[in-house]
């Protein structure tokens, strides 16, 4: 009898103490499932592990700062961003019911038994979440013989962090300088799989944890055929193109929304703007770090002065005659050029429309080039870097009297907002059956 009790206690210790030093020594990595973590569904860099003598027992070994069965809980999160849709912290209000509470499962629209519960942040806990896109995180509380959605008051909204970088560090886009990704943490690299190989296509800018803004001409097809989303990947936090970076985040493309009025028939690229919705295999969006941050969108009526100093960044060619793209992220400074000069002095009013803004180096030594398309032109406004333009087109690279032409982002704020909200609404409209 004592032997049976001893063996039972020992087995329980082995099963429940997976995150201890003992388990790190006696558990092995489940190489069979590691690449996609399909059985464990480990998030946030968690590792699927299995016990040597109990191969059917699989759990996630979480990195520091994360917990939960799938490493889905951010134990360090103390505030929420936006409306808190992506909040995965541990805040709870008095009276919050567990998401797997029988009353919640029976009466609630959102609960731990949904097929997409893990992606919504729901589980065997009562932490505040926002699975339906309300104004802030909430939880279910009892209301007599029913339950109700109650906004959480114990957690506050994070201070706005867009357009801020951890530091500015430049090392030598045409005539520019090598840049660490921390100086341009909103820069995105869009890759296309061609014959089994991921090849760099265009740049982009992270404007929301789930959204990248880029140029429509990157996906333009004269036949109007919709691009195949499955062949694209988006990288964030990447300083060097063809090497793995420990700080990078990799995403699949969930949606590609190009402006319906994009055209290149005038000789320029008009309405050259596109939105990309990104997600990981587990349904997550970008996680903020020193290497990955959002850039601020401009105010609707923002009109910066001529000669305002701005920055461009990308992985494009350093010279128009180069065969290969730059391996490192490059950055350069340009000055805004008046609309009148751009239309009449450097180009013409047919190619340059009011949907565009021009910028160039006074000495014509630095410029965006092939491969920088879709990338950011950011200008400082109210102490934050603001996405004022999207690299669109030009006549050569750093060619005298031929400045770069950029999509004027202020002209598309309503389009950006309406399309992001439309996709959000669509994604919420297909509710899981109870």
Swiss-Prot record:
EC class of the enzyme, as a word: hydrolase
Domain spans labelled Peptidase S1: 173-421
Entry's Gene Ontology BP terms: proteolysis; regulation of cell adhesion mediated by integrin
Reaction(s) catalysed (UniProt annotation): Specific cleavage of Arg-|-Val bond in plasminogen to form plasmin
InterPro entries in UniProt: EGF-like_dom (IPR000742), Kringle (IPR000001), Kringle-like (IPR013806), Kringle_CS (IPR018056), Kringle_sf (IPR038178), Peptidase_S1_PA (IPR009003), Peptidase_S1_PA_chymotrypsin (IPR043504), Peptidase_S1A (IPR001314)
Signal sequence, renumbered to the chain: 1-20
SS bond list: 40-48, 42-60, 62-71, 79-158, 96-139, 128-152, 162-296, 202-218, 210-285, 310-379, 342-358, 369-397
Pfam families (UniProt xref): Kringle, Trypsin
Glycosylation sites: 228
Record: active site: 217 (charge relay system), 272 (charge relay system), 373 (charge relay system)
Residues covered by region (Connecting peptide): 159-172
Annotated Gene Ontology cellular component terms: extracellular space
Family as reported in the entry's similarity comment: Belongs to the peptidase S1 family.
Protein name, per record: Urokinase-type plasminogen activator
Organism: Gallus gallus
């Amino acid at each position: 009898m004592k032997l049976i009790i001893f063996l039972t206690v020992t087995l329980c210790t082995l099963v429940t103490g997976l995150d201890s030093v003992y388990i790190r020594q006696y558990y092995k990595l489940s190489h069979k499932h590691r690449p996609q973590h399909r059985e464990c569904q480990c998030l946030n860099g968690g590792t699927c592990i299995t016990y040597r003598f109990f191969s059917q027992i699989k759990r996630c070994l979480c990195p520091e700062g994360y917990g939960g069965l799938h490493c889905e809980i951010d134990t360090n999160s103390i505030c929420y961003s936006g409306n808190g849709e992506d909040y995965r912290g541990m805040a709870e209000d008095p009276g919050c019911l567990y998401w797997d509470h029988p009353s919640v499962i029976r009466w609630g629209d959102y609960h731990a038994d949904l097929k997409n519960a893990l992606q919504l942040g729901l589980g065997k806990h009562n932490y505040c979440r926002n699975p339906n896109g309300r104004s802030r995180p909430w939880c279910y509380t009892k209301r007599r013989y029913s339950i109700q959605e109650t906004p959480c008051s114990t957690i506050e909204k994070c201070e706005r962090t867009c357009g801020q970088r951890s530091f500015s560090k430049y090392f030598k886009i045409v005539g520019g300088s090598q840049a660490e990704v921390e100086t341009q943490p909103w820069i995105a690299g869009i890759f296309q799989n061609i014959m089994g190989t991921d090849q760099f296509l265009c740049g982009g800018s992270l404007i929301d944890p789930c959204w990248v803004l880029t140029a429509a001409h990157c996906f333009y097809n004269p036949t109007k055929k919709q691009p195949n989303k499955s062949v694209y990947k988006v990288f964030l936090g990447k300083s060097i193109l063809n090497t793995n970076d420990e700080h990078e985040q990799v995403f699949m493309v969930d949606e590609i929304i190009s402006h319906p009025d994009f055209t290149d028939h005038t000789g320029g690229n008009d309405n050259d703007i596109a939105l990309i919705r990104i997600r990981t295999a587990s349904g997550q969006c970008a996680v903020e770090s020193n290497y990955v941050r959002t850039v601020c969108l401009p105010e609707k009526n923002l009109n910066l002065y001529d000669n305002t100093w701005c920055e461009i960044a990308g992985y494009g060619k350093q010279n128009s005659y180069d065969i290969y793209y730059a391996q490192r992220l490059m950055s350069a400074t340009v000055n805004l050029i008046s609309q009148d000069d751009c239309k009449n002095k450097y180009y013409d009013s047919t190619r340059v429309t009011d949907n565009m803004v021009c910028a160039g180096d006074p000495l014509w030594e630095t410029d965006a080039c092939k491969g920088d398309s879709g990338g950011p032109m950011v200008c400082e406004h109210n102490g934050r870097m603001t996405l004022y333009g999207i690299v669109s087109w030009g006549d050569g690279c750093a060619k005298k009297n031929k400045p770069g032409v950029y999509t004027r982002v202020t002209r598309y704020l309503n389009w950006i907002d309406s399309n992001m909200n439309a996709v959000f609404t669509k994604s919420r409209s297909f509710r899981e059956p109870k």
